[in-house]
Amino acid sequence: MHRTVLALSFMLLAGGLMLVAQTPSTDAPPQVHADMNQLMRGVLYPAANVVFSAQGDNPGDVKFVPGHDPNMSTDPLTSTFGGWQAVENAALALAESANLLSIAGRNCSNGVPAPTKDPAWTVFVQEVRDASMKSYRAAQAKDQDKMIETAETLSAACAGCHRKFRDRKAPENRCKVQ
């Protein structure tokens, strides 16, 4: 009996150690898979366009196209999760993307490291995050007037960062701290 308990204890301990060995470390730095240009074009730009579209078109008025499967729609507003929900989702994607903008190790398209440690970068990223969450709350409330205001705030946050870090005469100077 004693041997059985000892053997079972050993098996449980070994199994627990195997689980611990397979658990990803929380100390591992986030992996970067896209440069800044790819991140902007792939995530932030499309999501921002959904938020910006709510300035002129009420997402609640968007109609599904008869005969077209909303599961296959490439237009977020007419997809399965369309209308105001698409605007909510886009705003949340932008807010979460602010975290991606802060990850060290990401380069700009010209190979220059993104200036994640620059104080101005941190401010701009926080402005994007804040404006995105305001857009999310406006979309939840289905308040188009508030969407106009929050989209303008989001646009200003994006433009401020672009003026400082992107809009340079020579593309090789993008992301360089001046």
Put a short name on every predicted segment.
Residues 1-4:
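Positively charged n-region of N-terminal signal peptides that target proteins for export
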Residues 23-178:
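Mature extracytoplasmic or organellar-lumen-exposed domains after removal of signal/transit peptides
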Residues 7-18:
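Bacterial N-terminal signal peptides
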